[in-house]
């Protein structure tokens, strides 16, 4: 319907209502009609300018970045979620590093819907705005390789973190930095938190995969090399209550890796290390991870401090 028809219809509607209820077309009626016409005109202006009828919630942005990794000696990509309002301010944010699984890439968490989940929770006030970093790890288990010299662990915990802190408004300290991962990435997140105890304040192991030495990739090296990369053996070295970071473990009851994840949960309990353990319905799949994205983000938010240190304000 064009503008003239819309305005004419609004006028006729006001006068028609008066006639139906048996009242005269008085100056009051005409004033009411004018009000309706004015409202219709405003609506027409909004429609013509393409503005939404109600404000849309703000959304974050996912950007792709490539940087030079000194540990790997080559350029490496990562994707980074910047929360709503990031582009228009100077605020600094806590950061979560999310590692993909064996068959995944730096796009896996984005494809699962992590950006949309963060947008929803931030808009609802359920979590604070945060930065999410999703690096590329190929199929390297996020560990320093014992056999070929590829330092995938250092690349993740040092190179990626330093690049983010240098180029984005992250809060560059342990209390405001968490790490997590799914499947192979869960193994990686745990061993990195244990091997770099001053870097992360929380670690999330989602659908945790813990390999035995006999089934580990060859780049894990000898039994002694394996022990330095195995979360089960690393956590034993911390001693009772020895972890300085929050730990979350979840896995589906139909996941083929559930039994070893249970063993890790038991080891933490025996050592007196506080942690969260969740056994949920589900398997080792994208459907399972997508269903729990908001649970993961709530855990990270609760573990992170968003207070900006005074030194970063100067």
Please place each PLM-identified region on the residue numbering.
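Non-catalytic cap/lid and distal C-terminal segments of serine-dependent acyl enzymes
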Residues: 3-314
């Amino acid at each position: 319907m064009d503008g003239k028809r819309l305005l004419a219809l609004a006028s006729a509607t006001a006068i028609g209502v008066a006639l139906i209820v048996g009242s005269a077309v008085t100056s009051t009626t005409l004033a009411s009609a004018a009000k309706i016409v004015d409202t219709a005109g405003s609506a027409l202006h909004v429609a013509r300018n393409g503005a939404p009828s109600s404000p849309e919630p703000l959304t974050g942005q996912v950007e792709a970045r490539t940087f030079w990794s000194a540990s790997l000696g080559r350029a490496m990509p990562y994707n980074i979620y910047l929360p709503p309002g990031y582009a228009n301010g100077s605020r600094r944010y806590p950061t979560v590093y999310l590692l993909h699984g064996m068959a995944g890439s730096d796009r896996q968490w984005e494809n699962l819907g992590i950006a949309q989940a963060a947008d929803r929770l931030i808009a609802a006030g359920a979590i604070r705005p945060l930065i999410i970093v999703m690096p590329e790890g190929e199929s390297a288990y996020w560990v320093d390789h014992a056999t070929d010299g590829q330092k995938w662990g250092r690349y993740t915990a040092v190179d990626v973190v330093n690049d983010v802190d240098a180029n984005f408004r992250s809060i560059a300290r342990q209390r405001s930095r968490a790490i997590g991962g799914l499947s192979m990435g869960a193994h990686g997140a745990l061993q990195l938190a244990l091997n770099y105890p001053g870097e992360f304040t929380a670690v999330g192991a989602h659908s945790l995969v813990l390999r035995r030495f006999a089934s580990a990739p060859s780049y894990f090296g000898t039994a002694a090399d394996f022990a330095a990369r195995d979360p089960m053996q690393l956590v034993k070295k911390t001693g009772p209550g020895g972890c300085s970071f929050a730990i979350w473990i979840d896995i589906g009851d139909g996941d083929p890796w559930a039994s070893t994840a249970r063993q890790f949960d038991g080891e933490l309990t025996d050592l007196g290390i506080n942690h969260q353990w969740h056994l949920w319905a589900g398997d080792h799949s994208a459907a399972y991870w997508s269903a729990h994205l908001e649970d993961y983000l709530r855990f990270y938010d609760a573990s992170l401090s968003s207070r900006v240190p005074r030194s970063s304000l100067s």
